Design a protein with these regions (language model features):
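Conserved class I S-adenosyl-L-methionine
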Residues: 114-127, 132, 149-151
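Conserved AdoMet
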Residues: 2-120, 260
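Residue-level signal for inorganic ion chemistry
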Residues: 97, 226, 251
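Extended basic-aromatic, gly/pro-enriched interface segments that bind polyanionic ligands
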Residues: 143-227, 231-242, 264-266
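A short glycine-rich, Lys/Arg-flanked "PGG" loop and its adjoining helix->strand segment in the class I
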Residues: 241-253
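Core SAM-dependent methyltransferase catalytic element
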Residues: 225, 266-282
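A structural alpha-helix within SAM-dependent methyltransferase catalytic domains
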Residues: 98, 134-138, 248
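Conserved beta-strand signature within the Rossmann-like core of class I S-adenosyl-L-methionine
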Residues: 254-261
């Protein structure tokens, strides 16, 4: 174990330790930490080493691969996950969703009357995406009698805590219209001045859950719409292909799958039908 003096220095991340950590992260959550990510790993994990009183990255790796270190393994994945997002990110996707929701709602009131409209935000980060989905549903469907369920999952417990609270600083709201802000958010006062909280009626539409995309989704994840955006860019091709085919299996017939604009299913073996760039249908 390290001595207090180590808090004042930056520990060396040896290539052998970086490779071990990279393999572990890939096995656990599919993230591909190539050689260009070495400094990022060093920077983000150094704090964990200092707080955990570890003398080296080797000691830290040994700990997170033991039964006693499983909680710290979760914290390590949290630290290495990239969670940058904002409300209505890639707005074209929400425009497409608005155009197909009436058809989906009609199906619930026709042949599938009473069936629940299920949407899965598969890498929800700090909650902006699923809340954007909930607002879109409310805007398009209003109070129509269509049961709706939004499942929001992420591997990071840290961002899920933020998502559940639904409180965001003013700068995260810069692309949200005044009408949306007034209708679906509460502006803070006192110590919360400069913050907005998603109103309870919208928060109640979303169920948050920690889930690793490398695991098999349970049957109750079956969805009509899946948003799995800006996460596959961190995976290698075999992992991307595995994930895309899992998403296909969990998607209901005629359902839609949205991926990030910087992502593509080109070159991957999959059964999806192409709709438009970054939008696919089963």
């Amino acid at each position: 174990m390290k001595t207090p003096e180590h808090n004042k220095t930056t520990m060396e991340l040896k290539e052998s330790d970086f490779q071990k950590i990279s393999r572990l992260v890939h096995e656990q959550c599919g993230i591909n930490l190539h050689d260009g990510k070495k400094e990022l790993v060093k920077a983000r994990l150094s704090k964990r080493l200092r707080e955990g009183n570890f003398a080296s990255f080797s000691d830290y790796y040994r700990h997170v691969t033991t039964d006693e270190g499983q909680d710290e393994l979760v914290m390590m994945i949290d630290s290495l996950s990239t969670n940058l997002t904002y409300f209505f990110r890639e707005f074209g996707h929400f425009k497409t969703l608005r155009s197909v929701l009436p058809e989906m709602a009609a199906a619930r009131n026709g042949d599938r009357k009473g069936a629940r409209l299920q949407i899965w935000s598969a890498a929800c980060s700090s909650g902006e995406e699923p809340y954007s989905l909930a607002i879109t549903l409310r805007e398009v469907l209003g109070n129509k009698p269509v049961p709706v369920s939004i499942l929001a999952t992420d591997i990071s417990t840290r961002v899920l805590d933020t998502a559940i609270r639904g409180i965001y600083p003013r700068e995260r709201m810069k692309d949200v219209s005044d009408q949306i802000l007034k209708t679906y958010f509460r502006y803070g006062s006192g110590k919360w001045t400069g913050f907005y909280q998603v109103k309870k009626e919208i928060r109640d539409m979303v169920r948050f859950l920690r889930f690793n995309l490398m695991d098999l989704p349970p049957a109750d994840f079956a969805s009509d719409v899946i948003f799995c955006r800006n996460v596959m860019i961190y995976f290698d091709k075999p992992t991307q292909e595995m994930l895309v085919n899992r998403l296909y299996r969990i998607l209901n017939k005629d359902g839609y799958c949205f991926v990030g604009h910087s992502e593509s299913l080109t070159g991957l073996a999959h059964p999806f039908n192409y709709v438009e760039p970054s939008v696919y249908r089963k």
